[in-house]
């Protein structure tokens, strides 16, 4: 009987020691601090100012402000959700200064 109890305790301790799906460095949830968009489940690491802390945030929805792309992996405005396009500044200056903002539009709907 003692051996069964010990085996059960060992099995429970192994089960609790196994890491969960939540990330520490990658696979971060929205609202968690990040240093690059590749760390976030949503693929968007956003900060509100140059000195602000960046956090994982959802991608921009239709008619929301967006960034075309970033050279640094951190956005002031997140890129659009899948199926939407960000119509805005696509110049190299906008990419370097991270001010290439636009609005998310459904490309299929705007052609009709």
Swiss-Prot record:
Extract the signal peptide range: 1-17
Regarding tissue, the record states: Expressed by the pancreas.
Family designation = Belongs to the colipase family.
What GO cellular component term, any one, is given?
Answer: extracellular region
**InterPro entries, A to Z:** CLPS_chr, Colipase, Colipase_C, Colipase_CS, Colipase_N
| Gene symbol of the encoding locus | CLPS
Q: Which UniProt keywords apply?
A: Diabetes mellitus, Digestion, Disulfide bond, Lipid degradation, Lipid metabolism, Secreted, Signal
What is the official name of this protein in its record? Colipase
Q: Where is it located?
A: Secreted
Report the record's disulfide bonds: 34-45, 40-56, 44-78, 66-86, 80-104
Species per Swiss-Prot/TrEMBL record: Homo sapiens (Human)
Source superkingdom:
Eukaryota
* An example Gene Ontology biological process: response to food
**Known SMART domains for this protein?**
COLIPASE
For this protein, what is any one GO molecular function term?
lipase binding
Binding partners and assembly: Forms a 1:1 stoichiometric complex with pancreatic lipase.
Q: What does this protein do?
A: Colipase is a cofactor of pancreatic lipase. It allows the lipase to anchor itself to the lipid-water interface. Without colipase the enzyme is washed off by bile salts, which have an inhibitory effect on the lipase.
Propeptide feature ranges? 18-22
């Amino acid at each position: 009987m003692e051996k069964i109890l010990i085996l059960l305790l060992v099995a429970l301790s192994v089960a609790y020691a196994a890491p969960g799906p939540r990330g520490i460095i990658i696979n971060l949830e929205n609202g968690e601090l990040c240093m690059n968009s590749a760390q976030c489940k949503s693929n968007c690491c956003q900060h509100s100012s140059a000195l602000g802390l960046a956090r994982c945030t959802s991608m921009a929805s239709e008619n929301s402000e967006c960034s075309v792309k970033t050279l640094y992996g951190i956005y002031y405005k997140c890129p659009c959700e899948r199926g939407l396009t960000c119509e805005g500044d696509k110049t190299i200056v906008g990419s370097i200064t991270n001010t290439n903002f636009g609005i998310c539009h459904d490309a299929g709907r705007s052609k009709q």
